[in-house]
Amino acid sequence: MQNGTILQFFHWYYPNDGSLWKKIKEEAPRLAQMGFTAIWLPPACKGTNGTWSSGYDIYDLYDLGEFDQKNSVRTKYGTKQEYIDAITAIHDAGMQVYVDIVLNHKAGGDEAELIKVRKVDPEDRTKFISEPYDIEAFTKFYFPGRKGKYSDFIWDFRCFTGVDFDNKTKETAIYSILNDYGEGWEDVIDDEKGNYDYLMYDDIETRNPAVREELKKWGEWYCQTTGFDGVRLDAVKHIPPAFYNEWLDHMRQVTKKEFFAVGEYWAPGNLPLLLKYIDATEGRMSLFDASLHHNLEAASKQGRDFDLTTIFNDTLVAVKPELSVTVVGNHDTQPLQALEAPVDPWFKPMAYALILLREKGYPCAFYPDLYGAKYKDKGGDGNEYEIYMPGVENIEKLVQARKDIAYGTQRDYLDHANCIGWTREGDDEHKGSGCAVLLSNGDEGFKQMEVGKRHAGKTFIDYLGKHPARVTIDADGKAEFHVAGSSVSVWVAEDRG
């Protein structure tokens, strides 16, 4: 069986020219050949910003680029038919499709309602700082451009827990809506800001049974319409775990698919929170390993001062590898984004080796690391910046190595602050498999490592071409392997036939 590898096929600043669905359709065969087994596509539903929407400012779940709404028929990425054609092409190439689902909030309501709210302290949302009073909020959604096709469900204030704008006074604040489903916010895992149920826009009220049923009905429709194989669930930190337990169980039952699910619970450096969420969802979904990403970023910033023996300390992949999706970057951590924490370019080849060539975790590569990216935006300081993200050196070879070479027993040599390595013995199923990986964040390094007696007498070379040596494996399956300074080498049999 081939090792699984995900590609996130978008980034926040992908051009809004409607080309993405067409591009993945063209690229699918090449990506499958390279070694990718699943493609994570961006949110396909119409956002309130129309063609300018990256998909997370969700307006209409049933509009996949089909209806003239928010000043456009297509989304940023293309039309509904182009989306379905792209999914067909990905499937034809032998890969799976993971769709990005935003069920935390809705944006761009069609009509304002007069609703009763209490204002809360933004830093402690459990503290009410006003008596109940009326505001005007855009909480009515009836999707006039769709005219009831696929669903005639009308969303109103009873479908939401909170909003952040009073259209009457034009005041921006966080308002808890008084409805029939409790005195305040929904119960979520994180007590950051007192209660972090509210994130943005109109926050969906999953305590309302009509809302839960509509979201299940939509999930069925979406799966039947597109045939996706898995889901990436946005902002699960802000949604009660009980909702996704119910939703995922329902979806798997009615679709007869054990489809893959990964949640975005971004809590860098806070492994206990990730584990708490995994306990609450009882293993129904994987999570992105925000803790490992935190370590990779720190390693890239600290250079030789970072102790590489600690790279997997307090990470999800170390304690729950079967539910860990490992990443080097994503659309939230890229430069100028809300959770900006990019891994510096010099360290990225090492970071990708750490997620792609080891036995644990389900790695996910990021679009700009394969294709590069260039864009402009304002930073947190209000100034405009031009960003260039170069493609990562040797990333295609590293993905290919995961596909062809990184199999069999793993032996770790995480024993030096500036130079660590591991070996994979290889197996009979994958011809020519087996490797020795060595990386250094300081000077040139070397390490004696065992690749297994099955390789005795073979000559190993650096698959990445970063080190010129040729290494002979001794009768015990061992050899001394080398790596250049601030670099990674992947040693493989010269003759892998």
Where are these regions (language model features)?
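Active-site-proximal helices and loops of the catalytic beta/alpha 8
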Residues: 2-4, 26-32, 36, 45, ...
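The substrate-binding groove and active-site-proximal loops of carbohydrate-active enzymes
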Residues: 8-19, 58-80, 197-212, 229-238, ...
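Residues at alpha-helix caps and immediate loop-helix transition turns in enzyme cores, especially N-
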Residues: 20, 82, 243-244
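Substrate-binding cleft of carbohydrate-active enzyme catalytic domains
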Residues: 75-109
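Core domains of carbohydrate- and sulfate-ester-processing enzymes
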Residues: 119-195
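Active-site-adjacent "subsite" loops/lids of carbohydrate-active enzymes
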Residues: 182-225, 236
